[in-house]
Amino acid sequence: MAIVGAGPAGYFSAQALQSFSSEKTTFKVDLFEKLPTPWGLVRSGVAPDHPKIKSVSKVFEKISDDPNFRLFANVEVGQDLSLEELKSNYDAVVLAVGTPSGKKLGIPGENLANCWSSAEFVSWYNGHPEYSKLNIDLSGKRAVVIGAGNVAMDVARLLAMNSSNLENTDISDYALDELKKSQIKNVWLCARRTAEFASFTAPELRELPELEDTSVIISSKEIEGAMDRLHSDAGRHVRANLEAMHAIACLSHREKNKTLEFHFGVVPKEIRGNGKVESVLFDSGQGEIVVEADLVVTAIGYEIDSEWGLRVEGNHFENSDGLIEDNLYVVGWAKRGPTGVIGTNKSDSAEVIKRLFLDLTKKDPKQVQGIHKLLENLSPINLSEWRRINEFEVANGMKSNRPRVKLMTTKEMVDVAKGQS
């Protein structure tokens, strides 16, 4: 089996395949990843001040210990290898490629300097090698974050918090340096819909009052109005969200160094500026408002990469319960769209792999030579080489009381992996 994409959906697919192995049937799993490092958004998407979420990486490493598991990192399917070449060399191919691009608002001004998608901004502060050179300018006074989910909250929280709270995390060194120099004092978190439709989760909201250097401001009138508008069948998570926001709204505020303000029901119409972000025009439902801004981050979701040449439906590859076409399957966000938490991918992958297993029981295994000839001109990073990177980063982190100090460039990663550093 070939799995493309070494994020949670890819690893959980490998785990599901391993669970179907028996004395009669053995699944050999090759996991391909375009970066030199696996783990996907667990490495490059989870906020650095949320280390508990990253602990799922221990599960991934246990999955990797299976003798029939191989990692081929630093190999980009679609560039280094074609999808057709994989399909010719494996009994089945599973795409676990996620939805890597930030969704666009589709309004004027999105291409101005210092307007970023959350996909870019989060990858930047998490040390993704493809985003390490972004020229993110934190020298202004106000940042506007547009979105109403946990990613938007992560971005707003990191911009509003005291950077000293990030010193013992695995945030990228360059992002930590920039946040230490940041002049941003006011962060607006702007949601297009009213508070009852926000996709935050209550635990993340409850963390916000712990920001000792930051006043968190939510209108109690807005939250009480949202509570009044709730239908009787509203889910528990919605009520928990509103209760958490109401608790914040009721806090007394002493003057602090920074403010994080929630604004609901404000629809962005235009990002304005002369070559660079200067303000954002919103429709508040009662008229237009112009908010001065020096940085804009849009966090309204992610989009599928259509360069695979596969049909896209909505925001995922067209599929029938995970089957795209004969011997080609899809899991995770690429299957269902960018929804759910890390654990959602486990059940999702298990369902698709069960179907794959049943499909393969009706066929004879392919007699192929393997992919080594296809890889002979490439420089794949295998499991032991990835673990060399991992050990190097963790060892460097121990010197400064951090979980790890990430290598920032593909070259650095390859050099360490190959023992050339």
Model-based region annotation:
Residues 36-37, 194:
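Helix N-cap at the beta1-alpha1 junction of Rossmann-like dinucleotide-binding domains, i.e.
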